[in-house]
Swiss-Prot record:
Source organism phylogeny: Eukaryota, Metazoa, Chordata, Craniata, Vertebrata
PANTHER family per record: CALCITONIN-RELATED (PTHR10505), ISLET AMYLOID POLYPEPTIDE (PTHR10505:SF4)
GO annotation terms (biological process): amylin receptor signaling pathway
Function, as annotated: Amylin/IAPP is a glucoregulatory peptide hormone that plays an important role in the regulation of energy homeostasis. Selectively inhibits insulin-stimulated glucose utilization and glycogen deposition in muscle, while not affecting adipocyte glucose metabolism. IAPP function is mediated by the CALCR-RAMPs (AMYRs) receptor complexes. Amylin can also bind CALCR receptor in the absence of RAMPs, although it is more selective for AMYRs.
Identification of the protein by name: Islet amyloid polypeptide
Highest taxon, organism lineage: Eukaryota
C-alpha cells in the first residue's frame, strides 16, 4: 500500500512545482521612505549645498578632518602622561 502512495505523492509534488514555476511572482518595488530625523535633514542640506556650489560658488570652505589634523592627540603623549587622580584613596 505504501508503494502505491509514493508515486501519487511524487506526481502531486511535480504538479505543484510546475504550478509554482508557471505563476509569475509579483515584485513589489521598494518605496523610498521620507525621513524626518535631524541626521537626514542635515544630510539633505549638505547634499543641496554640494550640488548648488557649482552655481553659487564655494559656500563652505573644506574642513580638514583627516587623520593628521591639527590638535589630534598622539597615542605616545597619552601613554606617557601621568594618570589623573581625581579621587583620593
Amino acid at each position: 500500500m505504501c508503494l502505491l502512495k509514493l508515486p501519487v505523492v511524487l506526481i502531486v509534488l511535480l504538479v505543484a512545482l510546475h504550478h509554482l514555476k508557471a505563476t509569475p511572482i509579483e515584485s513589489n518595488q521598494v518605496e523610498k521612505r521620507k525621513c524626518n530625523t535631524a541626521t537626514c535633514a542635515t544630510q539633505r542640506l549638505a547634499n543641496f549645498l554640494i550640488r548648488s556650489s557649482n552655481n553659487l560658488g564655494a559656500i563652505l570652505s573644506p574642513t580638514n578632518v583627516g587623520s593628521n589634523t591639527y590638535g589630534k592627540r598622539s597615542t605616545v603623549d597619552i601613554l606617557n602622561r601621568e594618570p589623573l587622580n581625581y579621587l583620593p584613596f
